Amino acid sequence: MYRLRALTAATVGMVQLTRRHHTGAFRSYQRRRLMLAALAGVTGISASAGLMWTRAYAEAGSSVKHEEQMREEEPLKDVAEEAESDGALESSSGEDEDEAGSEEKKKKQRIGFRDRKVMEYENRIRAYSTPDKIFRYFATLKIINEHGDAEVYMTPQDFVRSITPNEKQPENLGLDQFMVKRYDGKDFWQKISQDREKFADEDSIFYTLGECGLISFSDYIFLTTVLSTPQRNFEIAFKMFDLNGDGEVDLEEFEQVQSIIRSQTSMGMRHRDRSTTGNTLKTGGCSSALTTYFFGADLKGKLTISSFLEFQRKLQHDVLKLEFERNDPVDGRITEKQFGGMLLAYSGVQSRKLKQMQKNLKRMFKDAQGITFEEVENFFTFLKNVNDVDTALSFYHMAGASIDKATMKQVARTVAKVELSDHVCDVVFALFDCDGNGELSNKEFIAIMKQRLMRGLEKPKDMGFTRLVRAMWKCAQDTAWDFAMPKQQ
């Protein structure tokens, strides 16, 4: 308050000084005194403003300093915890160890100011950057083979992180920053394969990506295309290139199907081959391991639409499994808040509203039993038919019937042939029951679930400026043509 009064007084003084200076009421020495006083006042105000800014900056950066201090103290804490755990092994029972482990899992490090800014930057990379830059930013492994040639790879965890908002890249890894592994002998690739992520399902799709389960740039484009394209689009594309009508396509026809589907996706439209970084699409749009998986070792086999749709289903299952495991399930269950986070990950909801929705979930289901992967998978199977679900719920709405939990379960049984548990319905209604009357907010639910199904990959990879310029140019052309060639009456 004192600073504001001083600023006001100095301003008034400057105004009066200006008026008197122009009227010539003061002599020259008095003018000099007033000028010196005004200069001193301005200097004081500038110093005060600088102190205020320094204080505000220090308060804003306190979370960063606190976070760095926490990171420096983490190794010491780990050593102390190891020493304590060694002593506990000698003096306590296995039950005490389980309790200590559960308490350790409950501790969650608070996200600091720096991490929030980094995650916002990474979200912009996911939303607006080219596939080449996204791949180079989120890939973590660079392998130099026996010939000295280097190639960048993603692990399955990197792939999930590259398409999931608010998932921070590990420290010291970023754009063109990788863990480098050089060829050092015959067992080199065996060591690489031993380091790959372990999956719950032995028939995971990622095991078809060569013996190491790593994802090249061509595989990255192919997998994102498969994830972002509805099943119906693939069915139509296969029928278009199935000239003899036997329901099968060969390798050449499949390359044409890929090219057409990829050109319709936002990721494919943004891609440009970049020889400087080595991120160019190989012939066929996918790796030799995937083409071997589809067409056999001699590449002379046939691929049916049913086989390809099964590949798409298994890929969606594996990515969903990785997303589930990233939440560190306890006894095979994740919390209701984590399940809500999975549903809202690609919603585009403002962060403040998102936090409030998650807080409501945590408060309402404080002592709940959690959600299993089977329940999560059933709900996402229900979401695969989201367009039919939208139609069914619209019928209920137009008929004047309320969309309650029983209605949702009936729609799931009718449309998707799955049974939703009562607990999952409770969580969904807690998120999307805006007015608390026990009825679903249909429009918001369907809009968010459509974005969740495509994982945000269907959104245009630009900020709208190029589309605006293109529309203005088209309008100008049409207007000029109409002016030059007026319509005859």
UniProtKB/Swiss-Prot annotation:
Chief subcellular location equals: mitochondrion
Q: Where is this region: C-helix region?
A: 467-477
Q: Name the SMART domains for this protein.
A: EFh
Q: Where does Ca(2+) 2 bind?
A: 433, 435, 437, 439, 444
Q: Where in the cell is it found?
A: Mitochondrion intermembrane space; Mitochondrion inner membrane
**According to the UniProt entry, which residue ranges have a biased composition of type Acidic residues?**
81-101
Q: What does this protein do?
A: Calcium sensor of the mitochondrial calcium uniporter (mcu) channel, which senses calcium level via its EF-hand domains. micu1 and micu2 form a disulfide-linked heterodimer that stimulates and inhibits MCU activity, depending on the concentration of calcium. At low calcium levels, micu1 occludes the pore of the MCU channel, preventing mitochondrial calcium uptake.
User: Domain notes, please?
Assistant: The EF-hand domains have high affinity for calcium and act as sensors of calcium levels. Lysine and arginine residues in the K/R-ring mediate electrostatic interactions with mcu and play a key role in mcu inhibition in absence of calcium.
Its recorded name reads Calcium uptake protein 1, mitochondrial
